Regions:
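Surface-exposed interfaces of beta-sheet-rich extracellular modules
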Residues: 1-3, 52-86, 208-253
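Conserved "repeat-terminator" motif of extracellular CCP/Sushi domains
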Residues: 3-29, 79-147, 152, 243-281
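Solvent-exposed, conformationally flexible loop/turn segments
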Residues: 7-10, 44-53, 84-88, 114, ...
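Local beta-strand/beta-hairpin segments that build beta-sheet-rich folds
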Residues: 35-43, 159-169
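Terminal, regulation- and interaction-focused segments at domain boundaries
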Residues: 39-42, 51, 202, 207-209
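Calcium-binding motifs, dominated by EF-hand helix-loop-helix domains
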Residues: 189-191
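Acidic carboxylate motifs that coordinate Ca2+ or other divalent cations, activating on Asp/Glu
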Residues: 196
């Protein structure tokens, strides 16, 4: 402290004590680096409460794609200015850059989009960092598919007309979106709908940001030829998805969306007609024979 010399030795000297100003600093740093994103320098009297909150700056950083790791100011047990003018108080707030995850785009029809696999690093730029778990991957909600199943059946039944010549056909249109995750554990922060890698809709959102991974339409599917059967004329078109003459299932007329229902379509077949050869009287009758199929025409 300061030494006071009395003006009149032997008499009481009045000494007025004044609290000095103290300084404190709150730094926002990126985890695992020396990068300081922001610094607030504060000043106040010794012993006075530090009038400050990290909420505003953390909200700004979140909007810029950062997630809180530790808040050394809010969790501090003593948030008053100290009494040591020689040493400034330092509080550290640590944040981490969020990671956008976009599924792969299928290269072949009916191939599924792919997310990372369990054991892969959550942040590809930090291969030695935290790894994906199956539990975290299952919660990403960034891949959906609309399926179309075509079954070729005998008219009036649910029996397949020929599992070998006319096997059941299933195809799909897949949709993906970019999920933004916390690099520490892969938990969902939100979804990126603008393409900048930053979450702009909440983690609870189920409808935003979806895009078709390839074509958004089901392609035309010609009905197969089945020996002894022809497609039934005047088919149920099932919402104009099946050609009335049964020759094909139509191409989608409009783009599908992630909310489009799955399609379960039936193409019906009937037996071909028969003919009975006429033989001279007294000859052994010949059993009726089915008309032969046109190998290029299911009808």
């Amino acid at each position: 402290g300061k030494v006071v010399t009395p003006q009149k030795p032997g008499e009481d000297t009045r000494i007025v004590l004044v609290k000095v100003n103290q300084k404190a600093t709150v730094k926002y740093v990126v985890e695992g680096t020396d990068t300081v994103l922001h610094k607030d320098e504060l000043e106040g009297k010794s012993g006075a409460p530090i009038d400050y909150t990290t909420a505003t700056k953390l909200a700004e950083l979140k909007a810029g794609g950062y997630e809180l790791v530790t808040d050394g100011f809010t969790t501090a047990t003593d948030k008053n200015y100290d009494n040591n003018p020689k040493v400034d108080q330092d509080f550290l707030v640590t944040v981490a850059k969020t990671v956008p995850v976009t599924p792969t785009t299928p290269q072949n029809p009916n191939e599924d989009p792919q997310n990372p696999q369990p054991g892969d690093p959550i942040n590809p730029e930090n291969p030695s960092g935290p790894k994906w778990t199956k539990e975290a991957l299952d919660k990403l909600n960034n891949i959906k598919s609309v399926t179309r199943t075509i079954t070729y059946i005998k008219d009036g039944t649910t029996e397949e007309v020929s599992p070998t010549e006319a096997p059941k056909w299933t195809d799909k249109v897949s949709f993906t979106r970019t999920v933004v995750v916390n690099p520490k554990d892969g938990s969902v922060v939100g979804y990126d709908t603008t393409g900048d890698g930053i979450a702009d809709v909440a983690a609870t959102d189920t409808t935003s940001g979806w895009k078709a991974a390839g074509t958004a339409k089901f392609t035309e599917k010609t009905s197969p030829v089945v020996k002894g059967y022809v497609v039934k004329p005047n088919q149920d078109t099932q919402g104009d998805l099946v050609e009335a003459d049964g020759s094909k299932v139509k191409v989608s007329t409009t783009d599908l969306t992630v909310d489009s229902p799955n399609q379960d379509l039936k193409v019906r077949y009937v037996p071909v007609g028969t003919w009975t050869p006429k033989v001279p009287e007294g000859e052994t009758p010949i059993n009726p024979s089915p008309y032969p199929n046109d190998p290029t025409d299911p009808g």
